[in-house]
Amino acid sequence: HLMKNDFFFHIGKAIQRLYLDEIFYFACNGKKIEIHTEAGVTTFYGTMQEVVAQVDGKGFWIIHKSYIVNSSYVSIYQYDVVQMTDGTILPISQKYRKLMKSCLTELYRKG
């Protein structure tokens, strides 16, 4: 059976699996999706909608039409950018800034 904490994607005819906990963020580059992990970058053909369908409600935040981040690897949050634990700085688009702020406020209250 499929594991709830895995991300599945196709490379050629093969189905690949990564643990969600290992994924720093997803980046959309045209018709390709880049999966950034500590081990490096894996690329597959797909859409961000396909990514959202698998990671929704599992600790990932949409911060931009081209970026979905694993909240566990966000080290610094600013109004218009996040910095990941690996030092990568990613933009937060205007569309998602209010949502990000409310998510972080909620986390801060719970913490």
Question: At which residue positions do the language-model features occur?
Answer:
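Inter-domain helical "communication" segments and dimerization helices
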Residues: 1-6, 103-111
